[in-house]
Amino acid sequence: MKRSGCVGLTIMICAGMLAGCGSSLEADTNTVYVSKHGKIVTMDVEQLDQSYYDETELKEFVDSAVEEYNTENGKNSVKVDDLTVEDGTAKLRMDYETVDDYTAFNGVELYEGKIVQALAAGYDFDTDFAGVDKDGSVTGVTRGDILAQEDLKVVIIKANTDVKIDGKILYVSCDNVTVTGKDSVSIKEGTGIEKTWITEAEEVPSTEAVLETESTEDAGDVIEGEVIIGTEEASGNDVVTNLSGGSSGTDVYTYIIYK
């Protein structure tokens, strides 16, 4: 069930409640935590106009939304773990029984499973990836390298938010992603991992940097070849994302592959 028709404060419910890792997590930014059993814990950090809302009013709204969802989807599908309002900042921590509950309640696409299962579900992994070393540095990796390890776990999300997983990150997609720890990433539009490596598919001897157009006279067909010899530089820190509105929507899928 996707919640809609939200104004002002209700953005906290509809635009995505961001996750933290476990009920004991204290996060200062929107974060989504995916546990090893597929349960989701979220922390949403929201700046409020205190002239409109206070802690009691906010709690009543959240409790009502949760009760409505659970009535339709089963008891304890979604639970409020903690809610505080201090100095104009609201922190809302919630528990979701399943990934599907998180997606249905927030309208934010989220997937968790093995790579082979994600492929069967229709995710194509058609993007640039980077390998994450023990020290947090990144290296080049191909899509084929990743798909060959189909039993690895993957979290796929379509949102601008921080994400933590219960495991060690091995690979991440490059667009809009910054690796912040062995088990965490930050997703913000305008940031990302700059691809400074060339994959095997892109490698071309220097004498062949430019391919000539070949024509086949008999068939009348023209075959054109194009070689990618570089990539555009990412804008990196030039773009700053305002997190005060919660997890904002995006058209980009972020892939986090781990064990």
Locate each region found by the language model.
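Positively charged n-region of N-terminal signal peptides that target proteins for export
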Residues: 1-12
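Short linear motifs at secondary-structure transitions and domain/linker junctions
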Residues: 8-9, 65-71, 230-233
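C-terminal motif of bacterial Sec signal peptides marking the signal peptidase cleavage site
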Residues: 17-20
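Bacterial signal peptide processing site
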Residues: 22-24
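N-terminal Sec/ER secretory leader and immediately downstream segment
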Residues: 26-86
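Mature, soluble, non-transmembrane domains
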Residues: 85-259
